[in-house]
């Protein structure tokens, strides 16, 4: 570990914190329907979209209607994307003559992008046309992110409102998230990435001749526009197979820093939106503090594990840290930081190969996802995921002191706790259930490229990533098979919608309740004690659930490596 590496981490944290309040204030005005700096230009477009769609922006929805609209929209998006992938060979903007995507891969890919997972069992430059990348994937990058933001805002309204049955309008919230937040920021970022050397063209792939006289095909395309929203919307799916490790997808150290920043900025700022809308910004800062503590711990362990030679590397006499699978233009510090950011934020983009990390270095990204993607998390999804843990933490605190649990003046009762636990428990069911199946059936065992505990980790990582809607992978797993495409897609669907629907049910229940005045016995939820309790609940409920599985994978691999034991390649 070096001073330069710690300075990069400190600078990143400082810039994120500096942007929380201004962006949080802006988004609060957007979702409250107030005038913003962009209103003169965008308000007429917003009203025009409502007229075309037949939407009454003043008509609000109950939680059930809100959930129904959300599901209907996502089903329509899935059908259209699946059709586009299956028909891409017949459609324009296909200069590389890409064939139609196979049915199981199209099912997996459509599910992946609709759920904001962006798991990729394919290489983008060898599988998809420009039209599929733009109209299919980039479009879903916008609307899947906006859908998550809308659900988060609905949950915030559940805490902020009292004695009402409505949570706002899904159509209005999603439109405003896209039009006022995602599109403007993505446009600025895309232009910046082009200035750094990122391609943005509809021209065919470039045919080049190498110095040895060999012919080479250089893949290009509308890269910058997709990368901008893939990071900002915590989608993560790469235009190229190597994702952000590819020089065309992440050309410079500055583009790398901006990509890391854009992954966290909206999720962090939404905690401030929460504080503002419930009338106490300290509540948002407390939640952000809990997220920050978990994030800092993860960065520290990952950076230490990758920067220090140990285990097999130490036995080989290597002292420069683990550079395998990392880009020299980024180095160990930026690669470790990126890995923790992308798995904490449900993004899934990578600038280094996680499969090549040390056992402990790979454990932290895995654990980040298993905690439920609540360390900043996906845009919207991170906040509502952490608020689910807040409900459980407040319930536990109430049990300890023998009082009816309250949060922000709302009683936390059986219905809220049941819905919270449903949202929490569906993730380990998918992650561990499918991992168990894959380790005993031939189709599952054919996937990992490594034997021993690392092969198990490759399977566990895949299902963890899918259910957590992250999308990153241990690249040694051959996932483009009928078995993995199908089971991973099921994990993505359950991990997305079996969390969002209980969250909206909690929001509807809370919005209907009366607000109780604070009393001497009210547990303060803006101080260090609450932050510690929340972190403890996340680690106990989210972390201990997976300890046996982690012990069979990265933990065993770490101790085996320390003893100099390696495992042969092969499933």
From Swiss-Prot:
Keywords: Cell inner membrane, Cell membrane, Ion transport, Membrane, Potassium, Potassium transport, Transmembrane, Transmembrane helix, Transport
Record's keyword annotation contains Transport: yes
Listed transmembrane segments: 5-25, 64-84, 136-156, 179-199, 220-240, 254-274, 285-305, 330-350, 375-395, 421-441, 488-508, 527-547
Function field: Part of the high-affinity ATP-driven potassium transport (or Kdp) system, which catalyzes the hydrolysis of ATP coupled with the electrogenic transport of potassium into the cytoplasm. This subunit binds the periplasmic potassium ions and delivers the ions to the membrane domain of KdpB through an intramembrane tunnel.
Family: Belongs to the KdpA family.
Self-association and partners: The system is composed of three essential subunits: KdpA, KdpB and KdpC.
Protein name: Potassium-transporting ATPase potassium-binding subunit
Organism: Methylorubrum extorquens (strain CM4 / NCIMB 13688)
């Amino acid at each position: 570990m070096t001073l330069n590496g710690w300075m990069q981490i400190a600078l990143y944290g400082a810039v994120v914190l500096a942007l929380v309040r201004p962006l949080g204030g802006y988004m609060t005005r957007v979702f409250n329907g107030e005038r913003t700096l962009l209103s003169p230009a965008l308000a007429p477009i917003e009203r025009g979209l409502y007229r075309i769609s037949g939407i009454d922006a003043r008509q609000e929805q109950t939680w059930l209607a809100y959930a129904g609209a959300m599901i209907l929209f996502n089903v329509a998006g899935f059908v259209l994307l699946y059709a586009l992938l299956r028909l891409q060979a017949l459609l324009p903007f296909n200069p590389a003559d890409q064939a139609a995507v196979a049915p199981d891969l199209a099912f997996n890919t459509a599910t992946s992008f609709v759920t904001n997972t962006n798991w990729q069992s394919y290489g983008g430059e060898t599988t998809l046309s420009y039209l599929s990348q733009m109209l299919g994937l980039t479009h879903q990058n916008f609307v899947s992110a906006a859908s998550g933001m809308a659900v988060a805002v609905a949950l915030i309204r559940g805490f902020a409102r009292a004695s009402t049955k409505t949570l706002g309008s899904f159509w209005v919230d999603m439109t405003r998230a896209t039009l006022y937040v995602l599109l403007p920021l993505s446009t600025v970022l895309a232009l910046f990435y082009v200035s750094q050397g990122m391609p943005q063209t509809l021209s065919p792939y470039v045919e080049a001749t190498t110095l040895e006289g060999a012919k080479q095909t250089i893949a290009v395309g509308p890269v910058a526009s997709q990368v901008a929203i893939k990071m900002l919307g915590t989608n993560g799916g790469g235009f190229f197979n190597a994702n952000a490790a590819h020089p065309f997808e992440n050309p410079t150290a500055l583009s790398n820093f901006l990509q890391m920043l854009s992954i966290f900025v909206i999720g962090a700022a939404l905690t401030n939106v929460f504080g503002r809308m419930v009338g106490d910004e300290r509540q948002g800062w407390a939640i952000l503090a809990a997220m920050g503590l978990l994030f800092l711990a993860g960065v520290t362990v990952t950076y230490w594990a990758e920067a220090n030679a140990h285990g097999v590397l130490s036995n080989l006499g290597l002292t420069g840290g683990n550079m395998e699978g990392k880009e020299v233009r980024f180095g160990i510090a930026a690669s470790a930081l990126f890995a923790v950011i992308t798995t904490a934020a449900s993004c899934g983009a990578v600038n280094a190969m996680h499969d090549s990390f040390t056992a402990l270095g790979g454990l932290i990204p895995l654990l980040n996802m298993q905690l439920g993607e609540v360390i900043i998390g996906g845009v919207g999804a991170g906040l509502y995921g952490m608020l689910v843990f807040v409900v459980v933490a407040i319930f536990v605190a109430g049990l300890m002191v023998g009082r009816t649990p309250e949060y922000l003046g709302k009683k936390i009762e059986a219905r809220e706790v049941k819905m919270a636990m449903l949202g929490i428990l569906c993730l380990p069911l998918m992650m561990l259930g499918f991992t168990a199946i894959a380790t005993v059936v031939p189709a599952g065992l054919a996937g990992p490229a490594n034997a021993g505990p690392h092969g198990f980790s490759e399977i566990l990582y895949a299902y963890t990533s899918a259910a957590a809607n992250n999308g990153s992978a241990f690249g040694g797993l051959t996932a483009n098979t009928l078995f993995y495409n199908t089971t991973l897609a099921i994990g993505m669907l359950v991990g997305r919608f079996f969390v969002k629907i209980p969250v909206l049910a909690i929001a509807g229940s809370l919005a209907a309740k009366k607000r109780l005045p604070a009393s001497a016995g009210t547990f303060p939820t803006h101080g260090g004690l609450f932050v510690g309790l929340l972190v403890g609940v996340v680690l106990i409920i989210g972390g201990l659930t997976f300890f046996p599985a982690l012990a069979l994978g990265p933990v065993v691999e770490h101790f085996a490596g320390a003893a100099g034991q390696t495992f042969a390649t092969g499933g």
